[in-house]
């Protein structure tokens, strides 16, 4: 499916619309996970309705990650240079770490909790090598052995690095890549894998609906806005947690 921009509007959702859905649901989730969580923990807010609101926001946030997983696999498929793509993810992993720790751990550095860009980078590193293997052999058995070993290696790395979504996140991304030719099957598998981390990931299945409506067009040129938004919004939430709660 082509991702080229086109002047003719296709029915369905563009890549930009998917990104906005992911950003909005992610922001709702992170607002709850950082600001509301610390407010509740510090008895800054004690009304019982806030706890219900907190959980509702976390459930809404489950929609974001499957969309990001789908967009990552699309990026791996259509990027001109997957190694540059990996480097970009790695740079933003480093940029995002202090804001992430501020927002989630009320600390400037927490060795036991790394941001999701590390998870994405590990998965993309595995996918990049899978693509190289695919170029060198057409034997299904060899390809599948490489897929399993690379997915396992990246997942183990995520587990020991304590990345966001841990090994489950990496497995979900690798599965989405391996099954990419069937979008719905890929995302059903992805969301099922995410259930390993928490029963709340049942809400992740909602993301399949907008993904199914994706029409293959990128939309506008806002690539770096979506990258910078992640550390920027975490920094804002982190400052609120650090100085106002």
Label every PLM stretch briefly:
Residues 1-245:
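Alpha-helical transmembrane segments and their immediate juxtamembrane cytosolic regions
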């Amino acid at each position: 499916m082509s991702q080229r921009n086109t002047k003719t509007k296709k029915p369905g959702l563009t890549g930009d619309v998917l990104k906005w859905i992911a950003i909005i649901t992610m922001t709702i989730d992170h607002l709850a996970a950082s600001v509301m969580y610390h407010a509740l923990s510090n008895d800054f807010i004690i009304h019982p309705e806030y706890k219900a609101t907190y959980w509702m926001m976390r459930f809404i946030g489950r929609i974001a990650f499957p969309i990001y997983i789908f967009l990552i696999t699309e990026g791996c498929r259509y990027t001109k240079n997957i190694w540059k793509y990996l480097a970009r993810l790695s740079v933003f992993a480093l940029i995002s770490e202090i804001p992430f720790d501020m927002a989630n751990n009320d600390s400037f550095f927490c060795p036991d909790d790394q941001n999701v860009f590390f998870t994405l980078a590990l998965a993309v590193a595995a996918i990049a090598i899978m693509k190289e293997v695919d170029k060198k052999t057409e034997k299904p058995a060899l390809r599948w052995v490489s897929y399993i070993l690379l997915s396992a290696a990246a997942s183990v790395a995520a587990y020991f690095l304590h990345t966001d979504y841990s090994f489950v996140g990496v497995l979900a991304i690798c599965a989405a890549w391996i099954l990419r030719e069937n979008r719905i099957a890929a995302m059903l598998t992805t969301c099922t894998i995410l259930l390993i981390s928490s029963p709340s990931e049942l809400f992740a299945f909602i993301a399949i609906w907008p993904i199914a409506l994706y029409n293959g067009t990128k939309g506008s040129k806002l690539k770096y806005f979506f990258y910078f938004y992640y550390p920027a919004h975490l920094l804002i939430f982190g400052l609120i947690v650090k100085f106002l709660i």
